[in-house]
């Protein structure tokens, strides 16, 4: 038996929305350069970009696995794997990101809706504390904007709020859900500052410069 729809469900992206993933990438680059040298660093990011083009999402561990097939006897690669898995993601949460989740919970269910691989992205959600903060309501797809029918099955609602740093994703979801969706564009991270992004995809319903500014927004009209 299907669940009755809630008045509103709040969906949050992870990377550069709740968590500073640009900083994570910088830390990985610095670690590779410092401990493994420029050649390893350059090759890793070359493979990473190739894999992102193939898969449509960032796969840090997948890039390492593919690198390993080219350098099977390089034992340093195993240490890189341990470093990635044990990365302190909680230290990279944006200020007031957990407060923003709690703020929205006053009006409805709060969930994570993210893209990524099946290992590193869930690990990121868990070690950052986001998994617990949303009561395990975590959905991770390859292209989340193509999975909205499944999102509706898991979290049926009369209205949705999507908080994301990518206008492209918000615009694609708006085309599908229309007036049932309120889009919130968080201008954090490199994607949010691409030249001409708002002209290309149109403005979101709400635009904020940082996730903490969500605390000043009242969504009570969505949950009468």
Annotate each PLM feature.
Residues 62, 82-112, 145, 149:
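Short, acidic loop-to-helix structural element flanking the phosphoryl-transfer center
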Residues 1-7, 126-162, 166-224:
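Asp-based, Mg2+/Mn2+-dependent phosphohydrolase catalytic module
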Residues 101-111, 115-139:
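Substrate-recognition/cap helix-loop segment adjacent to the acidic, metal-dependent catalytic center
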Residues 24, 35-38, 48-85:
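A metal-dependent, Asp-based hydrolase signature
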Residues 1-46, 69-70:
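Active-site neighborhood of HAD-like aspartate-dependent phosphohydrolases
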Residues 11-13, 113, 162-163:
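Generic enzyme active-site microenvironment
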Residues 94, 114-116, 166:
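Helix N-cap/beta->alpha junction signal
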Residues 18, 110, 162:
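Conserved SAM-binding loop
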């Amino acid at each position: 038996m299907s669940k009755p729809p809630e008045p509103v469900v709040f969906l949050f992206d992870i990377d550069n929305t709740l968590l500073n993933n640009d900083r994570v990438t910088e830390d990985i680059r610095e670690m590779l350069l410092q401990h493994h040298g420029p050649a390893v660093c350059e090759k890793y990011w070359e493979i990473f970009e190739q894999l992102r083009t193939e898969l449509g999402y960032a796969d840090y561990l997948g890039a390492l696995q593919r690198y390993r097939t080219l350098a099977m006897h390089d034992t340093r690669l195993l240490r890189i794997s341990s470093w990635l898995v044990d990365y302190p993601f909680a230290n990279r949460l944006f200020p007031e990101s957990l407060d923003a989740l709690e703020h929205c919970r006053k009006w409805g269910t709060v969930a994570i809706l993210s893209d990524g691989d099946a290992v590193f992205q869930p690990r990121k959600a868990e070690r950052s504390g986001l998994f617990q903060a949303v009561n395990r309501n975590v959905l991770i797809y390859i292209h989340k904007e193509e999975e909205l029918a499944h999102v509706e099955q898991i979290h049926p609602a009369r209205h949705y709020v999507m908080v994301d740093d990518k206008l492209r994703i918000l615009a694609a979801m708006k085309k599908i859900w229309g007036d049932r969706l309120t889009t919130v564009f968080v201008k954090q991270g490199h994607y949010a500052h691409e030249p001409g992004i708002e002209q290309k995809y149109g403005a979101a319903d709400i635009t904020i410069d940082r996730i903490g500014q969500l605390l000043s927004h009242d969504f009570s009209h969505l949950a009468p």
